[in-house]
From Swiss-Prot:
Pfam families: FA_synthesis (PF02504). Keywords: Cytoplasm, Lipid biosynthesis, Lipid metabolism, Phospholipid biosynthesis, Phospholipid metabolism, Transferase. Catalyzes the reversible formation of acyl-phosphate (acyl-PO(4)) from acyl-[acyl-carrier-protein] (acyl-ACP). This enzyme utilizes acyl-ACP as fatty acyl donor, but not acyl-CoA. Pathway: Lipid metabolism; phospholipid metabolism. Its EC number is 2.3.1.274. The lineage of its organism: Bacteria, Pseudomonadati, Chlamydiota, Chlamydiia, Chlamydiales. It is found in: Cytoplasm. It catalyses: a fatty acyl-[ACP] + phosphate = an acyl phosphate + holo-[ACP]. GO terms for molecular function: phosphate:acyl-[acyl carrier protein] acyltransferase activity. This is Phosphate acyltransferase. PANTHER family: FATTY ACID/PHOSPHOLIPID SYNTHESIS PROTEIN PLSX, PHOSPHATE ACYLTRANSFERASE. GO terms for biological process: fatty acid biosynthetic process; phospholipid biosynthetic process. The gene is plsX. One of its GO terms (cellular component) is cytoplasm. Belongs to the PlsX family.
Length: 319
């Protein structure tokens, strides 16, 4: 099937040409696969791209502005013709199968939620990301969409994480869940954590393995880790920073197999789960390698209709 993806060139921490270089690598790697890209950027950036021979392979859509990292959500909403807004508008109209941005997270989540319908019965969106573990990978959500959530919404996150893992599995594999906390004992955490613990145990039974500490996430003990957006974002950025620190300190002494296995940049960016259409948020600091992973990962997720499969799984679970 043909996949149509939109890429927001603007708003990240690096020059838009870094995004373009990653997209060029993706275009070269597709080897004739039916994928169409629409690139959203200001006219001056489009002008710079015309020098690339691959620029003829994409549709270029000019925006009047872009959402910066410093923009408030209100300022972003007011920019009706920003690259982010135009891309989400195209997704809303069904002209795209997915949209990718490394821009302002709060703005992207807010605009996406305003323009793209939520999956029925999903109360709040959550940023879902895959992290490498000793046994493969785990998904963790939320990592930044919603700072404060209640226990009922955390259960909703768990349902989405489970539906996501099931949608990527071709078998009837069972998956385990854990609640990110400051200790493994049931009594640990705030009153909200304790309430969430009881609800997860009641809803998921033996699939819920209880509380997990940050270090346990990488052990592969659980397949889905549930947390609020504040804690999840701190966890994710700490993990990314530690890997970058080790890569910088050890350099060539870090075995290639270890680099490949535990390099977070090879995974797609964060999926705004709960939306009926695919929106992927790449880290604002993403360089070419991470952006390549985000864009190529988006191709695979769009081709597999991951949002539709999550909605179907969610519907079956709720029925």
């Amino acid at each position: 099937m043909k996949v149509r993806l939109g890429v927001d060139m603007m708003g990240g921490d690096h020059d838009p040409l870094v995004v373009w270089e990653a997209l060029e690598e993706v275009l070269l790697s597709l080897d004739g696969q039916p994928v169409e890209f629409s690139v959203f950027a200001t006219p001056d950036v489009h002008q710079q791209l015309t020098h690339s021979p691959l620029s003829r392979s994409v549709q270029m859509i000019a925006s009047e502005s872009f959402v910066s990292m410093e923009d408030s959500v209100l300022a972003a909403v007011r920019k009706k013709r920003s690259s982010m807004a135009l891309g989400l508008d195209s997704l809303q109209r069904g002209e795209l199968d997915g949209f990718i941005s490394a821009g302002n997270t709060a703005a992207l989540v807010t605009l996406a939620r305003a323009k793209i319908p939520m999956i029925p019965a999903v109360p709040r969106p959550a940023l879902l990301v895959s992290v490498p573990t000793l046994s493969g990978f785990a998904v963790i959500l939320d990592v930044g969409a919603t700072v404060a959530v209640n226990p009922e919404e955390m259960v909703g996150f768990a349902r989405m994480g489970l539906a996501y893992r099931q949608s990527l599995s071709s078998s009837d594999q069972s998956f385990t869940l854990g609640l990110l906390n400051i200790g493994s004992e049931e009594r640990k955490g705030t009153d909200s954590h304790k309430h969430t613990f009881r609800m997860l145990r009641d809803v998921f039974g033996s699939a819920f393995l209880g509380n997990v500490e940050s270090g346990d996430v990488f052990s592969g003990k659980v397949d889905i880790v549930v947390t609020d957006g504040f804690t999840g974002n701190v966890f994710l950025k700490t993990a990314e920073g530690l890997f970058d620190f080790l890569r910088h300190i050890l350099g060539d002494h870090l075995e290639k197999t270890i680099k490949t296995r535990f390099d977070y940049t090879i995974y797609p960016g964060s999926i705004i789960s709960g939306l009926s259409r695919l929106v992927i948020k790449c880290h604002g600091k993403s360089r070419e390698t991470a952006l390549f992973g985000g864009i190529s990962g988006a191709v695979d997720l769009a081709r597999s209709n991951v949002c539709g499969r999550i909605a179907a799984k969610f519907g079956l679970e709720e029925a």
